[in-house]
Swiss-Prot record:
It comes from the Bacteria. Catalyzes the formation of 6,7-dimethyl-8-ribityllumazine by condensation of 5-amino-6-(D-ribitylamino)uracil with 3,4-dihydroxy-2-butanone 4-phosphate. This is the penultimate step in the biosynthesis of riboflavin. (2S)-2-hydroxy-3-oxobutyl phosphate binds at residues 86-87, 128. InterPro entries: LS (IPR034964), LS/RS (IPR002180), LS/RS_sf (IPR036467). GO terms for molecular function: 6,7-dimethyl-8-ribityllumazine synthase activity. Keywords: Riboflavin biosynthesis, Transferase. It catalyses: (2S)-2-hydroxy-3-oxobutyl phosphate + 5-amino-6-(D-ribitylamino)uracil = 6,7-dimethyl-8-(1-D-ribityl)lumazine + phosphate + 2 H2O + H(+). This is 6,7-dimethyl-8-ribityllumazine synthase. The gene is ribH.
Length: 156
């Protein structure tokens, strides 16, 4: 059986953007650092890494749309943190952010990773931003690198 997969390596020529939702920045700043670390560790050239800042997670899909429409990026890593509160706001923001990112990804056919935390409390967010449960920004970047290489291997 022939196995087709993407490797975790960059040539240094790939242009990747990180879209970061600034809301809950104490968490999202750490996700960005994790994503940047993964990019550099796997051979990325920092000159080819861009950081796009948006106010909150709800704005990520529109920034993603504009970033991919520009043709400037080979892939995009989306990070943010939506923390449940006492109102239904969490449900609306989480659902629409997820759907929006998925729709834009399918429209453009470019690798996009989903590193948006959807958690019940700040403790869970901090754990997923590098304290106990790894750094989900790092994981999101490795996922997008792997998919970028998979697309190349598939001739896409």
């Amino acid at each position: 059986m022939k196995i087709i997969e993407g490797k975790l390596a960059l040539s240094g020529k790939e242009k990747i953007a990180i879209i970061n939702a600034r809301f809950n920045h104490i968490v999202t700043d750490r996700l960005v650092e994790g994503a940047r670390d993964a990019f550099l560790r796997h051979g990325g050239d920092e000159a080819n890494l861009s950081l796009i800042l948006v106010p909150g997670a709800f704005e990520i899909p529109m920034a993603l749309e504009k970033a991919l429409a520009s043709g400037k990026f080979d892939a995009v890593c989306c990070v943010g943190a939506v923390i449940r509160g006492s109102t239904p706001h969490f449900d609306y923001v989480s659902a629409e952010t997820t759907k929006g990112i998925a729709n834009v990804t399918l429209k453009y056919g470019k690798p996009v990773s989903f590193g948006v935390l959807t958690v019940d409390n700040i403790e869970q967010a901090i754990e997923r931003a590098g304290s106990k449960a790894g750094n989900k920004g790092f994981e999101a970047m490795t996922g997008v690198i792997e998919m970028l290489n998979l697309y190349k291997n598939l001739g896409a």
